[in-house]
């Protein structure tokens, strides 16, 4: 009963973590871009 729960949690968290990392990296890139200009 634990394995399906863990797999569900992982499957739910992985896309959220990836999107979070992409958003933070994009925001940092935009911030550095605006600071350079």
From Swiss-Prot:
Entry GO MF terms: electron transporter, transferring electrons within cytochrome b6/f complex of photosystem II activity
Transmembrane stretches, start-end: 5-25
Membrane topology: Single-pass membrane protein
Record-linked InterPro entries: Cyt_6/f_cplx_su5, Cyt_6/f_cplx_su5_sf
Coiled coil: none
Pfam families: PetG
Family: Belongs to the PetG family.
Protein's name in the database: Cytochrome b6-f complex subunit 5
Protein source organism: Tupiella akineta (Green alga)
């Amino acid at each position: 009963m634990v394995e399906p729960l863990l797999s569900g949690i992982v499957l739910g968290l992985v896309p959220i973590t990836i999107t979070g990392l992409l958003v933070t990296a994009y925001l940092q890139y935009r911030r550095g871009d605006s600071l350079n200009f």
